[in-house]
Amino acid sequence: MHLTRILSLPALAVLTCGVALGQASLPHAPGARVVAISQPSERGNEPSIAVNPRSPNQIVAVFQGNAKAAYSTDSARTFTRAEGTVPDDWRVAGDVSTTFDNKGHAFLCYLAFDRLGTPYYWAHGAGRNGIFVRRSMDGGKTWEQNAVAVKAWPTGHEPNMQYEDMPRIFADNAPKSPYAGHLYVGWIEWQLDKSIMLFARSSDAGRTWSTPIRISTHAGLPRDDNGSLVGFIGTVGPDGTIYVVWSDGGTIAFTSSRDGGRTFAPSRRIIETGPPYFGDVAGVSRVMGFPQVGVDWRGGKRGGKVYITWSDYRNGDIDVFAASSLDHGKTWSKPVRVNSDSLHDGRDQFFQWMAVDPVTGAVYVQFYDRRDDPANRATRETLARSTDGGKTFTNYAWTDSSFTGRQAFLGDYTWLTAYDNRVYGIWAESVPVSDTTHTAPGRPPREGTVVYVGTADFSGMH
């Protein structure tokens, strides 16, 4: 069947998807559905999604556009937009992420600021800014009015003011962890002479946060470009060990904590990847390949196995890769290519995101995929799955229609989560838009972007 895309607010209707010939000869993602949760004129991007481990039919999805949110009570078949997440006392909010804790509370983490500093040299001339967390006690329907500051510069006139950027929130939901229920946030701090990674923790359901600590042994350059530190992401193992990765120049940096985030091992570079900022990707204003990390929670021979995924140019075009560790990150396997198109075909796969199913241990990776277009422009969404510990990946077509951007800003990331064979991905696609409100005189109208949630159900599959 043809993929029908329907937009409806505030209740957003399901987009039925029985994918026909998606991604040429790829098998269809089983039970695939795609739901739009934003309007083109909102130009949404940089989304995040989470599933409630206590009630897996509850899903929260958030996206950039002043920290907007939507919730679902039917396993992402439909979504309703939530109110009360946009911080009215700040000009801009973005870089959103979301998670549920082990009690079923939802959390929205975001960056808020009034103005940026010098372009790409954000700490130079920065205005007031900060990292904040907002809570929902009812699965994302309503959100507490007062957000809690993790770290903030509330006046913009503080001495030695820095710029806090790209926060990511995650929770310890491992049943046997001594720190179960704890929340963690990590982010980049741009300073005048360097970039570093900071980390904070909460042991009281996000009511208060610890004083941030630096977890990056090596500092990056102070510009938001190749050579800086970028792309913090963290996860928790079955014993409560925290694993964290980010891009450090042309490498992936890794560190871990065994005491609930109070202290971290010295960070070290583990995998050479090339620079994480990709230029000259047709139709997209910028693309980044920074890594993600996940852990197998189950027992057995793969219990506690740590996985990393990223994308880079080692084969000429952009490909997606994965590696794994069975010894808590001390040693790593050789990289495995996740996308299954021909090697050196000149067609890009980019903006990957990974999730490890905490129930089944299956590894999932989503990415934008251009394998069907010899011109390397038409873009679809592909979902890859590994059930053999990351040794091989089967690629599935998640969408059957492509989009072609005109230097669209899709953000710096997508997101993916999985629970008990059900997979939930979220991404942005560019679409034409007639709104010319934000168009400069003499230029064509800016294209819009729509945020989509894709679901797939691998129940009964091995």
Label each PLM-derived region with a short phrase.
Residues M1-I6:
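Positively charged n-region of N-terminal signal peptides that target proteins for export
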Residues S8-G18:
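Bacterial N-terminal signal peptides
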Residues Q23-H462:
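Extracellular, repeat-based ectodomains that mediate carbohydrate processing or recognition
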